[in-house]
Structures are given as structure tokens and as C-alpha cells.
Curated annotation (Swiss-Prot):
Role this protein plays: This protein plays a role in synthesis of starch. It catalyzes the synthesis of the activated glycosyl donor, ADP-glucose from Glc-1-P and ATP.
Any one GO biological process: starch biosynthetic process
EC number: 2.7.7.27
GO cellular component annotations of the record: amyloplast; chloroplast
Species whose genome carries this gene: Zea mays (Maize)
Reaction(s) this enzyme catalyzes, per UniProt: alpha-D-glucose 1-phosphate + ATP + H(+) = ADP-alpha-D-glucose + diphosphate
Descriptive protein name: Glucose-1-phosphate adenylyltransferase large subunit 2, chloroplastic/amyloplastic
Pathway(s) this gene product operates in, as recorded in its UniProt entry: Glycan biosynthesis; starch biosynthesis
Tissues where the protein occurs: Abundant in the embryo and is also present in the endosperm.
Recorded name of the encoding gene: AGP2
Amino acid sequence: MQFSSVLPLEGKACMSPVRRGSGGYGSERMRINCCSIRRNKALRRMCFSARGAVSSTQCVLTSDAGPDTLVRPNHPFRRNYADPNEVAAVILGGGTGTQLFPLTSTRATPAVPIGGCYRLIDIPMSNCFNSGINKIFVMTQFNSASLNRHIHRTYLGGGINFTDGSVEVLAATQMPGEAAGWFQGTADAVRKFIWVLEDYYKHKAIEHILILSGDQLYRMDYMELVQKHVDDNADITLSCAPVGESRASDYGLVKFDSSGRVIQFSEKPKGAALEEMKVDTSFLNFATCTLPAEYPYIASMGVYVFKRDVLLDLLKSRYAELHDFGSEILPKALHEHNVQAYVFTDYWEDIGTIRSFFDANMALCEQPPKFEFYDPKTPFFTSPRYLPPTKSDKCRIKDAIISHGCFLRECAIEHSIVGVPSRLNSGCELKNTMMMGADLYETEDEISRLLAEGKVPIGVGENTKISNCIIDMNCQGWKERLHNKQRGRSKSPDRPGRRILIRSGIVVVLKNATIKDGTVI
């Protein structure tokens, strides 16, 4: 802090109300005696900007307001920092989950296990906490029992400490006079609970609404997205990611000008419309070692930031009849509102199909992996299970993720994920497989009793060879089975009676399935 001259020290130590002066940059004058303790505290408060950053503000003597008046010019380029306490996150629980069937036959999409011990809902939830956002709404609809249970155990029942934050689960419900109670789209899901959000706003200083999806894998500081939203004074900001030719038509694609303003939005274009959305991405700083030419499109991630009042106006008045953000509201809103793009160049994967789910899990086993759950600064949270370490006896393990609480006995595991708490017996070979694990332990005595009764214990049995498979929770199989003998074969018939389905060349063993001895697929 600098002073232009020595100030006279007269009068009692006191502070008078702030009044405007005639200095440049909209300066403010604060009348204060320079020898007081209050002066030191007041000047320190005024000369330090948000988040503890030291300001370049100067206190100078003016000639038109008396000898004891200090002028504090506001810095013309001072940044208006976004406050996480002014942000509320809304996580969409997804629809019927047909693309991820049969994994969603008994659970909602965000409740699908990933990475050995996590659920998909843990991704946006953890990103929120790591970003300092702790006011979260989760909107659920289909098969929500396991999702509600996981949220309660992890985030409400003694798992994560939120301090002054909150997590609220909002289940789809019918209101009086409504014929269709289910959500008709992403925007309709938020609209159905506008009354909850409005009531929340009456008591909380929420200025921005962050809309998130519950079926993606990525690590993001959401406050960087919100900060750009604030810096651009945007009404809506879309988080976007570069994508390649093969998957571009699966997403909503955007074009934006040099200022970052979105000028064109096309939802899942095909043919000539797809070619029209191609852009030059050479200006982007890719976090992964990729060439810009491999990613000539910019896709919307389904992550949006809205000004609170803008969102309420769009859903209640302006577009009250429209149901989806991506295909309906955003293409219209960009002509009437300041819609900005935030380009995210780190790892991002949309878990929308069985193939993308399988590939995303297998990518975690690569060396080096494209995505890491392991980061002490931004960890991912999940339900605390209090399991012991994995026990491994004479096993061969290569490029694999083994979760806690597993029993591995004389088996071989390569490029696979083994979930909690799994059991693999002697002679078992696991390759290119996602094994989700089990809900409970079976002791050695319980296993012996089940075998004596002719029943099948939970786990993978002796001399079983499994490759290119997804094995759901609590699967029971014991001796000499071979799954997916011909890797990549996609025309094999489903076996619903045996609770085995094939999707995109991947064998999916359904939850709680029992596989008979000698089964070959």
C-alpha cells in the first residue's frame, strides 16, 4: 500500500460513511483517521480482493475533501470472482437407460458401477465438492432405489462432510392436473421442480444454476466454467469438448466466434449438416497427446451454466412448451441471449452405450491411462465400505485394477477391473473384462455348505476363462466356463433364460445370474 504524502493526525479515531469522490475509475473516498486501529483493519479489508489476492489499489491524498480523506481508486481491470456459494448444481438422473441396458434393468444410469468401486453419480458429485459447490439437487426417475441408497450412504449418512452444504434427491412425481408425470426431457425435468428451486432461492443467494449429467467420466473444476460465465456476462454457458468424426453425430455440435459466443448449434447432425459443423480446432491446447485434425468438431458436453433468472424465464415463460435443452431450447436461445462456449480439452467420455462404457473402463487399465481416479488434490468420493485389503495368493496380475476386499487364489488377471468384493478361484483367467463385484461376503463355511447343497457360491469358479465381458454384481459361477470364446463376435444369440446377453460384441452377464458349469459363449 502506498501513500502520496504524510497525512495530519487530528481528531478521534473514527470512520464516517463512505461517500463518492470525483476521482477516476469510479473511485470511493473513505474518511478515516490514520492513527486508529480501525483504520488498519478497514484499509486491509478494502485493499485485499476476493479469495485473499493482494490488490494493486493505492490510497492517495485528495485536495478537495479535507486533509483526512483517503481515496481508494477501484482497479479498472479488477476481476469479479465467481463465488461457489452463489452456485447450485442440478444433476440429471437420466431416463429409462435403454442404451445401457441390461446394466440399467434394475438400476438408474447414474447408479451403474465404474472403475471397480465407484458409481457414475460419484463423478459429478465429486467434481462439485472439489470445485467448492456444495448445494446439489439430484433428479431421479427410473429404477432409482439403488441410486437413492448410494447417495444416502455416501453423501448423507456419515460419508462426506458438507459443512454448510446440502444434497437433495428430487424424485419424479405427478402434480394435480398433470396427465404425464414422467420427465419428458432434460429441460422438463428441471421445470417440474421449478417450485422447489424457487423456494430455495428465497433463502439462499443463488445466482447461477449448473446443469450436469449423471453418465459421464471426466474431472473438471466447475468454478473455472462458472468464472468464464461471469467474465463474459453470459446468460448461458455451454461446456464443450472436441470430438472426432466417428462420434460427432452422437452429440449436439456448436460453432462460436472469436469472442466465444455460440453462433450455431446443431443437435446430432447427419450428412451435409454434419460437414457444415466442422471447425478448425488447432487453436486448442489439448491435454492429451492428440492432433487437432483428429477432432474437427466441438460437441456440447451436456454441462450448462444458466443465470438463475434466465433459466426461470426460459422454462416458465419463454419456452414453456419445450422439453429438452440440447435439441430445443439452446438452438432458439442463442439468437436472443448471450450464449458462450467453454472448451474443455481434458479427458471426457460420455457413457451412453454398452460399448462406450466397456471401452471407458478398459481405458483405465492402459499404461499410461487416459484418465486417473487417483489424485490427492481432487479425489473422487464413493460409499465407505470398510473392507479389508485384497488378499492375493500366487496370482499373476498385469495392467489391472483390483478393488479392496477381494479374494484372489492362483488366478491370472490381465487388462481387467475387479470390483468389490470379488472372489476368483484357482485356474481362473480374466482378460479384458469388467467385473463389478458383489454386495456381500460369503465365508468359507458358507461356500462349503452351498456346494454340499448343490448350489453355486458368488464369484468366478475354478478353471474359468473369461474375456471381453462385463460381469454384473453378485454373479454366481463355479467350474470350467468359457465366456466369449471368439472375441468381438456380435451375432451370437442372446440367452435371456441364462441371464446372458450380447451387446456390440460384448458378453454381458446380468446381475444375480447363475452360470452353469461348462457354459461356452
